[in-house]
């Protein structure tokens, strides 16, 4: 069964069409990436799922039934904007928010303490929200989203403010929840996280879908037009404008997107001529970041 299904959903604000005829479905127990540039309509879409906004056209189904006022109880929502009461203590905030989702105080208190320990905040249980760093507040907000054990999670930029260690911790918990049957809708600008976590994606721009489907199939469809290179020495051998369209450096490697019809062997020849030691030279599928840029750029051309 699909956990979520949108059919031709449209939302307007006066003369502005924020979302137009958007359709996608998310099977239960999967991680789905809702992607797009700033202002694309992602947050409006998430708010329609949460019934904060009502579509002007189209339909939304959640867990096999039309969305209604009970739908938010089945969803844990981590918004991009902070939604915590700054003068309340962590425990008080979590118990209060969990009670709104139907948990008893005892259930909420027990669950809150367990999650706080899991996220290394156990000693902060009686601290006020405004005493916490941004990263710590983000972890509390994540707990608020998962505390009532919802079957569906909507996480809008969940890694904001987190250092690499805590980002990895949240990622591992998200995958653990997925393995336990939760459906996760992830909205983020961090394409590397999408590649590691998402089963399928929908890329929207100006409120319209421009790319959707299983992530692996999408990457295959773009072909192996990228060379991943690891080398020691000067990188001037990559200054080949007739061959190289774009460079994407990460760590010790560089991804080189080839121009249409270009021969990757020209890069290798240039490296040898410059005396550069190549330790990796491999044709790979393009990273999602490159696909994102290409599709959005072509839409706005």
Predicted feature residues:
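Short, Lys/Arg-enriched, disordered terminal segments
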Residues: 1-2, 300-301
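ABC transporter nucleotide-binding domains
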Residues: 2-4, 11-205, 211
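Alpha-helix N-cap/helix-start and coil->helix boundary motif
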Residues: 10, 68, 91, 191, ...
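Short, well-ordered coil loops that connect the C-terminus of an alpha-helix to the N-terminus
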Residues: 15, 103, 121, 224, ...
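Residues that scaffold the ATP/ADP-binding catalytic core of kinase and kinase-like folds
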Residues: 70, 145, 218, 291, ...
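Generic structural signal for individual residues within well-ordered alpha-helical segments
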Residues: 94, 109, 116, 168, ...
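ABC transporter nucleotide-binding domain
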Residues: 171-258
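Short, charged/small-residue-rich alpha-helical element at the C-terminal edge
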Residues: 226-295, 301
């Amino acid at each position: 069964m699909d956990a979520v299904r949108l059919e031709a959903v449209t939302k307007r604000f006066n003369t502005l069409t924020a979302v137009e005829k958007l359709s996608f479905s998310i099977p239960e127990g999967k991680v789905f990436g809702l992607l797009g540039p700033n202002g694309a309509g992602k947050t409006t879409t998430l708010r329609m799922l949460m019934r904060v906004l009502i579509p002007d056209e189209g339909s939304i189904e959640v867990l096999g039934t039309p969305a209604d006022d009970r739908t938010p109880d089945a969803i844990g929502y981590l918004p991009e904007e902070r939604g915590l009461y700054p003068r309340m203590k962590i425990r008080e905030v979590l118990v209060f928010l969990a009670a709104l989702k139907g948990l008893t105080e005892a259930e909420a208190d027990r669950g809150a303490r367990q999650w706080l320990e899991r996220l290394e905040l156990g000693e902060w249980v009686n601290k006020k929200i405004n005493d916490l760093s941004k990263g710590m507040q983000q972890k509390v907000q994540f707990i608020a989203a998962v505390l009532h054990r919802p079957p569906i999670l909507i996480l809008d930029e969940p890694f904001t403010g987190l250092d690499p260690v805590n980002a990895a911790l949240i990622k591992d918990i998200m995958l653990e929840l997925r393995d336990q049957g939760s459906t996760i809708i992830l909205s983020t600008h961090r394409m590397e996280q999408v590649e590691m976590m998402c089963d399928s994606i929908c890329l929207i721009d100006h409120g319209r879908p421009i790319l959707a489907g299983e992530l692996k199939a999408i990457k295959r469809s773009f072909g192996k037009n990228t060379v991943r290179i690891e080398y020691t020495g000067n990188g001037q051998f990559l200054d080949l404008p007739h061959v190289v369209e774009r460079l994407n450096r990460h760590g010790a490697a560089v991804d080189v997107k080839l121009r249409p019809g270009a021969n990757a062997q020209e890069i290798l020849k240039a490296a040898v001529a410059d005396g550069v030691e190549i330790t990796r030279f491999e044709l790979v599928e393009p990273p999602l970041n490159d696909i994102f840029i290409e599709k959005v750029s072509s839409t706005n051309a």
